[in-house]
A protein has these predicted regions:
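N-terminal signal peptide
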Residues: 9-29
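Sec/Tat-exported extracytoplasmic proteins
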Residues: 58-62, 74-81, 95-99, 139-142, ...
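GST-like fold's C-terminal all-alpha helical module
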Residues: 171-192
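Low-complexity, Gly/Ser/Thr/Pro-rich intrinsically disordered linker/tail segments
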Residues: 202, 206-242
Length: 242
C-alpha cells in the first residue's frame, strides 16, 4: 500500500463536523475529516450508493445518517466486493439492526459493565479488551487480528481496538470485511433469511417466536432499503431463516 502525506494546511479551516470527500482513482484516498482518512489498495469497482436514496430509506425508518457516515460508507462500498444494490440493501438492513439505527458501535453490555467483559474478551496485549465494536460488532482477539491483517497488513486493531468504533472509515471497512468473509456467499442466493442465519443464527431457531420476530424485523428493514434503492419489491425473498 502506498502511503500519502496529507498537507496540514488542507485541514486548517475545517471543523470536525465538516467533510471533504476526494475521489482520487490513482491514489485511492478519501479524506472524510481531519480525523478520518480512508486509503485503499483495491480498485473502486463496488456498488455506488446515491445519497438521496439512502436518505429516503433512513428517513422512512425515522433515523438519520451524517455526512461523515455517508462519506465513509460510500468510500468503503465502492472499494468492496458488493456489486449491486440488492446486496447493498441486505447489508444495510443488518447494519441498521445491529447498530440500533447507526447509533451504536460498542457492545452495550460492556459499556455498562466493562469489568465483566475483561475476562471473556481479554487478549495477549495488556489492557486491551476485545469486546464487540463497529457496525457489525467485531469481537474476540482472533477476529481483531484477522481483520487487521486483512485490511491493513499489520496489527493496528490489536494494539488499538477502539479504532473499530472511533474511526468511521475503519468501522465501515470492518463491517464489509465481516460481510465478505461470512455472509456474501449466502447473499448470492437472494434469500434474506440465509444472510440472517450467518449474521445471528440464534434468531433462526425453530419454534422460538421471540427470536424469529427479531429476524422478521431485519427483513422489514431490508424491504425499506430495497424499495429506496429502486429494486422491485418482488425481489425481496424472506425464506432461509425461520
Amino acid at each position: 500500500m502506498i502511503h500519502f502525506a496529507i498537507p496540514a494546511l488542507l485541514f486548517a479551516h475545517l471543523t470536525i463536523a465538516q467533510v471533504i470527500i476526494i475521489a482520487e482513482p490513482k491514489t485511492n484516498v478519501t479524506i472524510l475529516s481531519p480525523k478520518s482518512i480512508c486509503t485503499f489498495d483495491t480498485p473502486a469497482e463496488g456498488v455506488k450508493l446515491d445519497r438521496k436514496e439512502l436518505d429516503a430509506a433512513v428517513g422512512e425508518l425515522k433515523g438519520s445518517i451524517t455526512d461523515l457516515q455517508f462519506g465513509a460508507l460510500s468510500a468503503a462500498l465502492s472499494h468492496s466486493k458488493i456489486k449491486d444494490k440488492k446486496e447493498a440493501a441486505m447489508f444495510m438492513a443488518h447494519i441498521w439492526h445491529n447498530s440500533a439505527g447507526l447509533k451504536e458501535k460498542r457492545e452495550l453490555y460492556c459499556m455498562v459493565d466493562l469489568e465483566r467483559c475483561k475476562e471473556p474478551y481479554k487478549g495477549v496485549l495488556p489492557g486491551r479488551v476485545y469486546y464487540g465494536r463497529g457496525y457489525m460488532s467485531l469481537a474476540t482477539e482472533g477476529n481483531y487480528r484477522e481483520a487487521s491483517q486483512a485490511l491493513f497488513k499489520d496489527d493496528r486493531l490489536l494494539k488499538n481496538p477502539e479504532l473499530v468504533a472511533e474511526d468511521e472509515c475503519i468501522s465501515w471497512r470492518v463491517a464489509i470485511f465481516f460481510w465478505e468473509r461470512n455472509v456474501q456467499d449466502a447473499a448470492k442466493s437472494g434469500k434474506f433469511g440465509e444472510t440472517t442465519k450467518r449474521v445471528n443464527s440464534a434468531e433462526c431457531a425453530s419454534g422460538d417466536k421471540a427470536a424469529n420476530d427479531i429476524a422478521r424485523r431485519r427483513f422489514g428493514y431490508y424491504k425499506v432499503f430495497l424499495k429506496a434503492f429502486g429494486v422491485k419489491e418482488e425481489e425481496a425473498k424472506e425464506e432461509g431463516c425461520y
